[in-house]
Amino acid sequence: MKHLISIFAAAVMFVACTSDVQVVKNTLRAPAYPLVTIDPFTSAWSAADRLFDAPVTHWTGAEHNLIGILTVDGVPYRFLGKESPRNRFIARASDQTGWPASYMLSRPSGSWMERDYDDSSWIFGEGAFGSPSRRPMIHTDWEGPQVWVRREVQLDKSFAGRDMYLYLTANEYATVYVNGIAVVDDTKKYSGEYIRLADDVTASLVSGKNVIAAVVTNPSGSAQFDVALVEKLPIQMRQEMTAEQLYADVQPMQTRYGFTCGPVELSVSFLAPLFLDDLDLVSRPVNYISYEVSSLDGVKHDVKISLEASPAWAVNFYGNEETLSQTFSSNGLLYLKASSVDQNILGKKGDDDRINWGSFYLVAEESDTQALVSEEGDMAFVRDLGSSRKAEGKFMIGYDDLYSVQYFGENLRPYWNRTGDVTIESQFE
């Protein structure tokens, strides 16, 4: 714990002031504000002028849910992040695990797109389909010119009236049917896009057998076809108000925000202690979120602060990958932890990929703090700051990636744990 306090205090003092340099507030409007900058795997940004106007995102654009709420005298004020609809994959897209399919490489006879069509003579394989260079996402090699695919989806209930989507990757183009009804029929390329299903298509999704059928064309070049069925879950509206943002200020090792939340002022700093003369500290997989609450009217106020995160931090494709969330305590600290179930270490490569191995951590001081984990794996801390005119504290965000780099086929440990005998808990203490 003393190690933690010394690093945090040194970083705060350094970025606040030095003996001969006065820190000047940065008034430039950033295209995106850095919040968490542990490494390219674990980074989070705000692409809004006000911190509460948009969801927090990874640098690739994928949402990394992070929501902060300050409750003053029973009134909640959201100062960080924003809720957004979530996708629940009823039939998963291809990842480390493929999906069963029947396919033909020549034009089949009859109404091959219909639900009750007999495809027993077709070839059995696994999706996704495409060029071998796209493995491990590809499970059946195919490079063209055409492939006919049928994917059976077993449902345990009707989805009539639900907000349903087709998730589609098709390079070059495809005609796609759901239970015999055309959903996509054009020459557009689709790269992980969501296509809303019309009411008649959604009404056709019944308990039992359903079929997604497609003919995919790839005249030349690299090929890929992946399809899934998705339900978009509505936002669970909460009654909190938003804070009033006073400023946003980006400095070399921190991004600072100021807010008013009713009768109190809230200052929040996202801090990354990247002292370049200390490689162990630079590689340390921990960032801080510090906060300070001050009464504006000189009166004591009852204040609670909460920080929420989703398992999206620990997976490449949130909603499509299974996750596990848990909580535990150690040496005066309270931990929230999220991990993918598959744990395929350094098993993927590409331009739009995120880490899906190792574990994400949200950490707080144990005193006066409650840790919550929902059935969906969402995690939250609620800390009671009591009744006072001034209070302060911090949360920590970290990631244990186990292995960071693959070098000529060999997985190498992160520098902070290069000997393999350092625990992630010690990095928070």
Task: State where each predicted segment sits.
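Sec-dependent signal peptide recognition
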Residues: 2-8
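C-terminal motif of bacterial Sec signal peptides marking the signal peptidase cleavage site
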Residues: 15-16
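Acidic/polar, glycine-enriched structural segments that form the non-catalytic walls/loops
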Residues: 19-34, 43-44, 49, 84-114, ...
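Aromatic-lined ligand-binding clefts that engage carbohydrates, nucleic acids, or primary amines
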Residues: 122, 145, 153-180, 212-214
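Extended, loop-rich substrate-binding clefts of extracytoplasmic carbohydrate-active enzymes
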Residues: 134, 142-146, 236-284, 365-377
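Short beta-strands within extracellular/lumenal beta-sheet-rich domains
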Residues: 141-156, 195-199, 254-257, 379
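Short, surface-exposed tryptophan/glycine-enriched loops
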Residues: 154, 192-217
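Edge beta-strands of jelly-roll/beta-sandwich modules across compartments, strongly enriched
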Residues: 218-229
